[in-house]
Design a protein with these regions (language model features):
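Helix-loop junctions and terminal segments of transmembrane helices
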Residues: 45, 50-87, 141-146
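Membrane-interface junctions at transmembrane-helix termini in multi-pass inner-membrane proteins
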Residues: 128-160
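Interhelical loop/hinge segments that connect adjacent transmembrane helices in multipass membrane
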Residues: 1-23, 66, 71-81, 202-217, ...
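Membrane-interface helix-loop junctions in multi-pass transport and translocation proteins
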Residues: 1, 151, 158-194, 202, ...
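Interfacial segments at transmembrane-helix termini and the short loops linking adjacent helices
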Residues: 36, 101-132, 179, 205
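Interfacial/gating helices of multi-pass transporter permease domains
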Residues: 3-12, 30-53, 78, 117-122, ...
Length: 252
């Protein structure tokens, strides 16, 4: 009786490992190809991103009990509605949070760390870019766990992680810069954390997958809007201390 449970836990653990691996492995590569200083800079930025992931992840978990109840009672139409609406709400909230952080990244790094680190704000933007999209995807992915479609997700996650490592190593050896490396990592994270869960979700509810993609596009559009507005506010105010930064974030 325990064997199916252990198999599922194994696949879930592998998928979680792949997610963390893609988000964190860049530190190892950067230390080897760019040096310890840049590793420390990116480590600080990634840590800030981890806080945002934790916050938005908690919001997504709030919908899990409702989805579980609907699935256990075989109310599949309700499950689809809860999934789509829940993912949209989570996507909008995380888009608002991450859009503001991205737009004000230069000021945040200046106040949080120092002016020298603030010059690497583009790195923070790339790191924050993936969070709203993957948070949306992970909420949709709860359905895959309910349907026990974790094996295919885990296998494809490992494939994406392996391809990401292979491409990164080749391009780094050819002299690829830091921003290019981070962009490749962001693409891998979005493929693994958003596109893949939705593709597997299609196996359970193919009739609603179009709506899932449309809602994701809406969240992404809102994310871009918040980012652009905050970036403009940041360019006007240029917060130099915590008080001014808080005012800037509130205005944004």
């Amino acid at each position: 009786a325990m064997k199916p449970v252990l198999k599922m836990l194994t696949w879930v653990s592998l998928s979680s490992f792949s997610s963390v691996f893609i988000y964190k492995i860049d530190t190892l590569f950067i230390n080897n190809y760019f040096g310890l200083y840049y590793t420390g800079v990116l480590g600080s930025i990634s840590e800030f991103g981890a806080y945002c992931i934790s916050l938005t992840g908690v919001i997504g978990l709030l919908f899990r009990p409702l989805m579980l109840i609907a699935y256990s009672e075989k109310r599949h139409e309700d499950l689809v509605k809860i999934t789509i609406n829940g993912a949209y709400i989570v996507g909008i909230i995380s888009s608002l949070l991450c859009g503001i952080v991205m737009g004000a990244s230069a000021s945040i790094l200046h106040v949080w760390l120092n002016d020298e680190i603030s010059h690497y704000s583009v790195w923070m933007m790339i790191k924050m870019l993936i969070i709203p999209i993957t948070t949306y995807g992970s909420t949709v992915g709860i359905v895959n766990n309910l349907w026990n479609h974790v094996k295919s997700f885990s296998i494809w996650s490992l494939v994406i992680a392996a391809v990401y490592v292979g491409i990164s190593l080749i391009l780094l050896e050819l002299g690829m810069g830091m921003i290019g490396f981070l962009v490749i990592g962001a693409i891998a994270a979005i493929l693994q954390g958003a596109i893949l869960p939705i593709m597997i979700y299609k196996e359970a509810y193919p009739q609603s997958v179009g709506t899932v993609y449309i809602q994701m596009i809406k969240c992404t559009s809102f994310f871009i809007l918040v980012f652009v507005v905050t970036l403009w506010v940041d360019s006007v105010m240029e917060a130099s201390n915590l008080f001014m930064l808080m005012i800037e974030l509130v205005i944004s």
